[in-house]
């Protein structure tokens, strides 16, 4: 965990996660979140777009961050993950344009 991070360091950390380790582990976000969306629909009967599935994860991270800040804290991982999910959203958008 980087204690004294500026915004660019957060974004670089998020970028390295979504284009490196996590993408290698989970596949491209379009494929990964298409599968997650399909599982969610099977469980709940609620249809989401792939973009909405990614945005749901952004909402989860923002909720955790809001709780941490309300408690006087700061949750580095939630900041990085939120930036990463926004990056995933962009990757999904561009992959669908092709």
List each language-model region with its residue ranges:
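Intrinsically disordered, low-complexity regulatory regions
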Residues: 1-98
């Amino acid at each position: 965990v980087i204690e004294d991070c500026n915004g660019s360091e957060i974004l670089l950390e998020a970028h390295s996660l979504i284009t490196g380790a996590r993408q290698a582990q989970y596949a491209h976000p379009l494929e990964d979140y298409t599968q997650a969306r399909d599982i969610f629909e099977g469980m709940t009967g609620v249809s989401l777009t792939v973009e909405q599935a990614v945005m749901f994860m952004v909402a989860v991270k923002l909720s955790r961050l809001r709780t941490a800040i309300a408690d006087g804290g700061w949750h580095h991982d939630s900041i990085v993950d939120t930036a990463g999910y926004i990056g995933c959203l962009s990757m999904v958008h561009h992959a669908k344009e092709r």
